[in-house]
Amino acid sequence: MKDSKESIRLGRFEFLAMNNPLRRWRWKHQEFPLFLKMLQMHEIYLSGKVIMDMGCGAGFGTELIVKELKPSQVIAFDIMPEQIELAKRRGLNVDFMVGDATAMNAPDSSCNAVFDFGVLHHIPLWRKTLEEAVRVLVSDGVMLIEEPHKMFEWTEFELGIQQAGLKILERRQWYGGFFRFFLTQKAS
């Protein structure tokens, strides 16, 4: 994947915030179970499928994907090489790489799911990133999105999701609306 200025590297504070035990606890006990519940409610099963973890950071979310969903392949990337080095230390059977979400290193229609654990708000060209996710998704592929409030005007964000070629199957608010979670599917 090419490195570009379209994605923003985390500052020191945010790097530490994303790699702390409280964040991992929230991922494991709140955020990821919510994604699992959404998938189950819509009878979407990703076991044995190809999953992309966009902006994987140190790989904690990637590890949850591997352990809980049991995909056949996981492609995980982050723009920060230091995050990828941390992710590789987890010893997972995952294709970790440094990459840019606005130019994903995957063939068209090659992934059954793309996960966004709070990455889009770091990317000025977030609409282009959504279009890239649609490009790599198979015809009925899904994208799971978790983003914080105040980073987006939600009406504009949902319109961007739809304009990229995704239909919103479900949306949920968390922590009094501070976070929003979306289960979307590539529109046919």
Please place each PLM-identified region on the residue numbering.
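N-terminal, positively charged/glycine-rich alpha-helical extensions of SAM-dependent methyltransferases
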Residues: 1-19
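Conserved SAM-binding loop and adjacent beta-strand
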Residues: 20-37, 152-153
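Class I SAM-dependent methyltransferase SAM/SAH-binding core
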Residues: 52, 58-103
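A short acidic, Gly/Pro-enriched loop at the edge of an enzyme's catalytic core
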Residues: 102-114
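A short SAM/SAH-binding and catalytic strip from SAM-dependent methyltransferases
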Residues: 113-125
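A short glycine-rich, Lys/Arg-flanked "PGG" loop and its adjoining helix->strand segment in the class I
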Residues: 127-139
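Conserved beta-strand signature within the Rossmann-like core of class I S-adenosyl-L-methionine
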Residues: 141-147
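Core SAM-dependent methyltransferase catalytic element
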Residues: 174-188
